C-alpha cells in the first residue's frame, strides 16, 4: 500500500511539473495557500449576512482556541446559511494577526439535518468541510472564517468562527 501511495504522489508531482499553471489550484484544494480564485477576490457584501456554525474540529466539539501543530492534519465541518441565494462555492479563510490570508477550498456537503431545520428549498447542500493532511503555515495567531460565492453572484464572509494558534 505504501508503494502505491508513493507511486500516486510521484504521478501527481509529475503532472504538476508538466502543468505548472494548475499547481496553485491543486494546492488550494488540499491545503491552505495564498492562492485565491477570481470569484473570491471581489468585494465582500457587508449588507448580506452569511450565517455559519462551526460544528466540529477534528470530529470533536470546537475548542475556544485551536492549537494546530505543524505537520498535523485538520478536519473542520460547518453549516452555513447565506442571507441571499444558495452556496455555489466555499473557501475556508485563515487570516493571520499581521493581515496575511490563506485560503483552502471547502467541499460543499449534504446536510439533511440543516435542511430539515430550515424548511427552505436549496438548503440541502449548506454544509461545508475541509480535510487537510498537513500544516506548513507560518507560526502565529489566526482567525478562521468562511467565504461563500452564492448563486445570486454575491461574495459573503462570516464573522470569525475560531481562533487558531500555530506554534
Question: What are the residue ranges of the model-derived segments?
Answer:
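Extended low-complexity, serine/threonine- and proline-enriched intrinsically disordered segments
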Residues: 84-105
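Short edge beta-strand/loop segments characteristic of extracellular beta-sandwich folds
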Residues: 75-83
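Short beta-strand elements
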Residues: 153-167
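Aromatic sugar-binding surface patches on proteins
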Residues: 111-132
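A short tyrosine-centered beta-strand micro-motif
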Residues: 140-145
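Intrinsically disordered, polar/acidic, low-complexity terminal segments
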Residues: 1-75, 163
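Surface-exposed, short loops/turns at beta-strand junctions within beta-sandwich domains
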Residues: 134-139
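Beta-strand-rich extracellular modules
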Residues: 147-151
